[in-house]
Curated annotation (Swiss-Prot):
Documented EC number(s): 6.1.1.19
Gene Ontology terms: cellular component: cytoplasm
Family, similarity comment: Belongs to the class-I aminoacyl-tRNA synthetase family.
Reaction catalysis annotation: tRNA(Arg) + L-arginine + ATP = L-arginyl-tRNA(Arg) + AMP + diphosphate
Subunit comment: Monomer.
CDD domains: Anticodon_Ia_Arg, ArgRS_core
One Gene Ontology molecular-function label: ATP binding
Name of this chain's protein: Arginine--tRNA ligase
Domain of life: Bacteria
Primary enzyme class: ligase
Gene Ontology BP, a term: arginyl-tRNA aminoacylation
HAMAP family linked to this entry: Arg_tRNA_synth
InterPro entries named among the record's database cross-references: aa-tRNA-synth_I_CS, Arg-tRNA-ligase, Arg-tRNA-synth_N, Arg-tRNA-synth_N_sf, ArgRS_core, DALR_anticod-bd, Rossmann-like_a/b/a_fold, tRNAsynth_Ia_anticodon-bd
Length: 577
C-alpha cells in the first residue's frame, strides 16, 4: 500500500479541476511534524505562480475538489498554501489488517523490469580488503530490495580477471613448478603475487617471459588459459567464504569478469571508427568528447586503443554496457562503484550513447559511494599503515561481538552464543555502513557500531526481540488474533499504524535511489515509535480483550516489518538476545 502515491493522484486530480496544468506536481510528502498531519501537499506554490494567483487561494480551490472521504479524517490549509492531510483512524485500521493478511505486508509489485546490478568487483590473485566492503553490501541491499519488489535482478560481479599481470603470475607459477594451483590458498597467493611482482621488476629475462605469456594468454592458447582459470578459481573460492560470512547473495554464477568482454573489443573499435566517432591520434585510437574539456578548453580525448594495440578499461566498460543491454536485455543498469570512477564512467557512457549501443530509455546509473575512514579521518588502515583485509575485519567483529553478548548472556549455551555473536558482529559492520548516506565518507568506529543504543544493528536486533517477547508473554492463539479487529483510538496507535503503512514508500525510495540508509532511518524511527506506543498504550494489561488484541496486532505488524526491512538490508535477526 503506497499512501503517498494514492494521495498524490487524488491531489493532482483536484489541482487539475482547480485549473492547474495536467502535468502539475502535487509534491505530497510525509509530514515532518505530527501537528502538520500525516502528509503534506506542497505543490501549490509552484503552480500558483504559473497561474498568477496566491498559493493559498489555489489551495482553497483545490480543497473544494479534493475528495478524501474514507482516507482522511481532516484536511487543512497551513501557512501560505500547504495542504495538511490527517489520515482517518478507520482507514489506518483497515490497512493494518490487510497488511497482516499478506505475506508481503501489503506491498504491491511494480511493473517488472530486468535490472543489472554491478557490485563487489574484487581482483583475481588478491584478497578482498575493506575497500570492497561498501560496494559489496550496499549493492547487495539494493539487489535484495529490487528482488523483493518483484524485479528480475541480474547480479554482475565485474571481477578484475584480465590484464598484463596475468603473464607475470603464470610465469611465476610455472617457475615455482606449482602447476597444482588448486591447492594454494589465497593467503599464499597474496605472497605469491608480491614475489611475482618483485621478480618482474628485478629480473628482465623473467619480465620478458611474462610479457610473452600475456600475448599467448590473449591469443587463447589452451595451456595458458588453463593456468589463468586456476588463478581465477582459487580467488573466487576464497571470496565466496567472505560473501557467505557477510550474508551477501553473490555466488560464483554471478561472476562476469573483464575477460568476458574481450571478444567484443576489436569490433567495438572498428565500429566506432566506422561511425566517425573514433579517430587516429599519435598512433592511438581516440574518441574526442565535446562534453568533457581538457585544461586548454578543448574536447577531451578518450583513448580506446593504445599504440601497441592494447585496450583500456574504457573500452571494456563500453563493451560491458553494450552487452548488458543487448545480451542481458537490461531495462536499467546500476553500478555500485566508488565516486573516484565517476568521470571515467561518464566518458564511457557518453561514447555508448553516441554509438547507439544503449538507448536513452535505459538508464545507466552510477550509484557512487564515499570512502571508509579511520577515527583520524584518513583512509582506514592497519596500525602498520597497510590495507585492512576484509577477513581480518570480520574476525575482529566476531570477536568483539562474542565478548559483548557473553557479558549480557553468561548462561547461554555456547552454540547459541556463537550464532548470536555472528548475527550481531556481522550485522554491526554492515549496518554501520548501510545507515550512512552512501555518497559521503564515513568514520569506522567499533564502539559506535556495537552500541545497544542509537541507530545501530544491535539496537535494531534488540528492538525486534523486544516485540517478540510481548507475544511470548501474551500466550496468544494465532487464529483468534487473526480474526480480531484492529481499533485505533489513541494518538500513539495512529502514529505507529501510519508509520507501519509507509513501508512500501520506503522500499520504493531505496529501489529508485539505491539508498539503503533511508530504510535504516525508517526502521530506527519505527522502533522508536513502537517504544513510545508500548510505554503509553498497555498491551498485556489493556482495559479489555478487544483493545489488547488490537494492540497485539500492531505489535505483530511491527515485528514483521522490522524483520522484513532488516532482511532487505541483509541484516540477520534473532529470536532472543
Amino acid at each position: 500500500m503506497n499512501i503517498q502515491a494514492l494521495l498524490s493522484e487524488k491531489v493532482r486530480q483536484a489541482m487539475i479541476a482547480a485549473g492547474a496544468p495536467a502535468d502539475c506536481e502535487p509534491q505530497v510528502r510525509q509530514s515532518a511534524k505530527v501537528q502538520f498531519g500525516d502528509y503534506q501537499a506542497n505543490g501549490m506554490m509552484a503552480v500558483a505562480k504559473k497561474l498568477g494567483m496566491a498559493p493559498r487561494q489555489l489551495a482553497e480551490q483545490v480543497l473544494t475538489h479534493l475528495d478524501l472521504n474514507g482516507i482522511a479524517s481532516k484536511v487543512e490549509i497551513a501557512g501560505p498554501g500547504f495542504i495538511n492531510i490527517f489520515l482517518d483512524p478507520a482507514f489506518l485500521a483497515d490497512h493494518v489488517q490487510q497488511a497482516l493478511a499478506s505475506d508481503r505486508l501489503g506491498v504491491a509489485t511494480p511493473e517488472k523490469q530486468t535490472i543489472v546490478v554491478d557490485y563487489s568487483a574484487p581482483n583475481v590473485a588478491k584478497e578482498m580488503h575493506v575497500g570492497h566492503l561498501r560496494s559489496t553490501i550496499i549493492g547487495d541491499a539494493a539487489v535484495r530490495t529490487l528482488e523483493f519488489l518483484g524485479h528480475k535482478v541480474i547480479r554482475a560481479n565485474h571481477v578484475g580477471d584480465w590484464g598484463t599481470q596475468f603473464g607475470m603470475l603464470i610465469a611465476w607459477l610455472e617457475k615455482q613448478q606449482q602447476e597444482n594451483a588448486g591447492e594454494m590458498e589465497l593467503a599464499d597467493l597474496e605472497g605469491f603475487y608480491r614475489d611475482a611482482k618483485k621478480h618482474y621488476d628485478e629480473d628482465e629475462e623473467f619480465a620478458e617471459r611474462a610479457r610473452n605469456y600475456v600475448v599467448k594468454l590473449q591469443s587463447g592458447d589452451e595451456y595458458f588459459r588453463e593456468m589463468w582459470r586456476k588463478l581465477v578459481d582459487i580467488t573466487m573460492t576464497q571470496n565466496q567464504i567472505t560473501y557467505d560470512r557477510l550474508n551477501v547473495t553473490l555466488t560464483r554464477d554471478d561472476v562476469m569478469g573483464e575477460s568476458l568482454y574481450n571478444p567484443m573489443l576489436p569490433g567495438i573499435v572498428a565500429d566506432l571508427k566506422a561511425k566517425g566517432l573514433a579517430v587516429e591520434s599519435e598512433g592511438a585510437t581516440v574518441v574526442f568528447l565535446d562534453e568533457f574539456k581538457n585544461k586548454e578548453g578543448e574536447p577531451m580525448g578518450v583513448i580506446i586503443q593504445k599504440k601497441d594495440g592494447g585496450y583500456l578499461y574504457t573500452t571494456t566498460d563500453i563493451a560491458c554496457a553494450k552487452y548488458r543491454y543487448e545480451t542481458l536485455h537490461a531495462d536499467r543498469v546500476l553500478y555500485y562503484i566508488d565516486s573516484r570512477q565517476h568521470q571515467h564512467l561518464m566518458q564511457a557512457w557518453a561514447i555508448v550513447r553516441k554509438a547507439g549501443y544503449v538507448p536513452e530509455s535505459v538508464p545507466l546509473e552510477h550509484h557512487m559511494f564515499g570512502m571508509m575512514l579511520g577515527k583520524d579521518g584518513k583512509p582506514f588502515k592497519t596500525r602498520a599503515g597497510g590495507t585492512v583485509k576484509l577477513a581480518d575485519l570480520l574476525d575482529e567483529a566476531l570477536e568483539r561481538a562474542r565478548r559483548l553478548v557473553a557479558e549480557k548472556n553468561p548462561d547461554m549455551p555456547a552454540d547459541e552464543l556463537e550464532k548470536l555473536a555472528n548475527a550481531v558482529g556481522i550485522g554491526a559492520v554492515k549496518y554501520a555502513d548501510l545507515s550512512k548516506n552512501r555518497t559521503t565518507d564515513y568514520i569506522f568506529d567499533w564502539d559506535n557500531m556495537l552500541a545497544f543504543e542509537g541507530n545501530t544493528a544491535p539496537y535494531m536486533q534488540y528492538a525486534y526481540t523486544r516485540v517478540l517477547s510481548v507475544f511470548r508473554k501474551a500466550e496468544i492463539d494465532e487464529e483468534q488474533l487473526a480474526a480480531a479487529p484492529v481499533i485505533i483510538r489513541e494518538d500513539r496507535e495512529a502514529q505507529l499504524a501510519a508509520r507501519l503503512l509507509q513501508f512500501e514508500e520506503t522500499l520504493t525510495v531505496v529501489a529508485r535511489e539505491g539508498t539503503p540508509h533511508v530504510m535504516c532511518a525508517y526502521l530506527y524511527d519505527l522502533a522508536g515509535l513502537f517504544s513510545g506506543f508500548y510505554e503509553h498504550c498497555p498491551i498485556l494489561s489493556a482495559e479489555n480483550e478487544e483493545v489488547r488484541n488490537s494492540r497485539l496486532k500492531l505489535a505483530q505488524l511491527t515485528a514483521k516489518t522490522l524483520k522484513l526491512g532488516l532482511d532487505t538490508l541483509g541484516i540477520e535477526t534473532v529470536e532472543r538476545m
